[in-house]
């Protein structure tokens, strides 16, 4: 199963180190489900702290989050 949603960054510091770490830790908890984050033409594996930070997503930016795998619904709910 694949779920894709467009989400807006609401953290006033954007997807900075702490927020990226929380998302990476969450993604690592889903062994059989891939979580990816896209901003414009750049894509990050949510398991990679560096990939997430390199997106440079700031407050108000829209990102596309995709979950793929048997726990896609649960993973998307956790991200949202």
PLM regions with names:
Residues 1, 50-54, 76:
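Detector for methionine-enriched segments
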Residues 2-6, 62-64:
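Intrinsic-disorder/low-complexity, polar/charged segments enriched in Ser/Thr/Lys/Arg/Asp/Glu/Gln
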Residues 8-55:
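Compact, glycine-rich, soluble single-domain proteins
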Residues 55-80:
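C-terminal structural segments of small proteins and small subunits
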């Amino acid at each position: 199963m694949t779920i894709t949603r467009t989400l807006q960054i609401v953290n006033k510091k954007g997807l900075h180190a702490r927020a990226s770490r929380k998302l990476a830790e969450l993604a690592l908890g889903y062994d059989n489900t891939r979580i990816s984050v896209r901003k414009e033409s750049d894509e990050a594996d949510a398991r990679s702290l560096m990939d997430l930070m390199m997106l440079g997503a700031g407050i108000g930016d829209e990102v596309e989050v995709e979950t793929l795998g048997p726990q896609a619904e649960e993973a998307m709910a956790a991200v949202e």
